[in-house]
């Protein structure tokens, strides 16, 4: 199981280094799936959008999106984050990603390999 992001699927301005790395994750996943399939080893990846973790939910991010506020918080960042999603949520929760990983690792997905599963509240649709 590999973890990419929505950046594995599309370009985002001013983040070429990040996008290149995340596209690489998807390429590795596909190569591993082809190479290891003969041994019945499945390889997949999950691709979240903004996740409610310290990596996203921090003062630097809040100030990046709300430089006009002295002490912006999550509630100030939420409208900007939600604009990137099709579903009306500003971010996904870590357990949403975990649940996708559990599905892909389970017998319920025993014939699923080489799949990049977005957990992105519809961000890739925009």
Descriptions of predicted regions:
Residues 37, 42, 112-114:
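Short, small/polar-rich loop/turn modules that mediate ligand/substrate recognition or access, typified
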Residues 5:
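Residue(s) in the substrate-gating loop at a strand-loop-helix junction
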Residues 21, 29:
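Active-site helix of classical SDR
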Residues 10, 101-102, 113-126:
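Short C-terminal tail/terminal secondary-structure segment
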Residues 48-58, 62-67:
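Short, flexible catalytic-loop segment of classical short-chain dehydrogenase/reductase
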Residues 74, 85-97:
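A conserved structural motif in NAD(P)-dependent oxidoreductases
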Residues 42-52, 105, 118-120:
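Conserved SDR Rossmann-fold cofactor-binding beta-strand/turn motif
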Residues 10-16, 38-39, 107:
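Active-site loop immediately N-terminal to the catalytic Tyr-X3-Lys motif
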């Amino acid at each position: 199981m590999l973890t990419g992001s929505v950046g594995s699927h599309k370009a985002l301005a001013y983040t070429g280094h990040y996008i290149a790395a995340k596209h690489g994750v998807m390429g590795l996943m596909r190569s591993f799936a082809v190479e290891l399939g003969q041994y019945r080893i499945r390889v997949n990846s999950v691709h979240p959008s903004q996740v409610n973790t310290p990596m996203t939910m921090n003062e630097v991010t809040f100030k990046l999106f709300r430089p006009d506020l002295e002490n912006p918080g999550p509630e100030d960042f939420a409208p900007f984050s939600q604009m990137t999603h099709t579903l009306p949520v500003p971010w996904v929760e870590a357990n949403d990603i975990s649940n996708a990983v559990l599905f892909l690792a389970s017998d319920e997905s025993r014939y699923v390999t080489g799949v990049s599963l977005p957990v992105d509240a519809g961000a890739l649709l925009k």
